[in-house]
Amino acid sequence: KDITYVKNVTAAYSRKLNDIIARSNGRYCRASLGRSNYTFEPNLDKTFSRGFTHYFADGRSADMSSPLTPKAIGQYVGTVKSINRNDITVAGTAAFSNGDGLCFFNGNDELQGFRVNRAQGNTIFPQRMPSGLSRGQALYRNSDQAFEKLLTGKSAERKINITMSLKESAPGNI
């Protein structure tokens, strides 16, 4: 896995563990000292998402796997509002960045993807217009350039509180 995945997953699980510990009334504690602070909001859907299932936790279920694809489709970003010769307008609230990777299921339920060459609001200009895309289809972002860029720099720090006491042991020696 790449560094973006590792940073995102580690931060997300660390926050979950902190929540569990905070609600445990002292029953659980961290094995390490200090506190980690993150410069981003962890979101597992942004770096890895194949959907999920409760498996057999609630009894047997028909949705135990994804029948359409074993690949990560990413985060839902909206539906296709219109398709023009060189651009696609998306209905939704997602912000797009140049270089984002988007995908969709075509009419044969096959996963297809394309790269956003340029984005202006909710209008995207693909590097190459995808075939098989039609109005009303759901779009998913499986590569989020803004999130990737955010995580390439310093994204976390760990601070440990200390108490120090300094004494002079000999004149001039501390």
Protein language model annotation of sequence segments:
Residues 1-174:
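Surface-exposed amphipathic alpha-helical tracts and adjacent flexible/coil segments at the periphery
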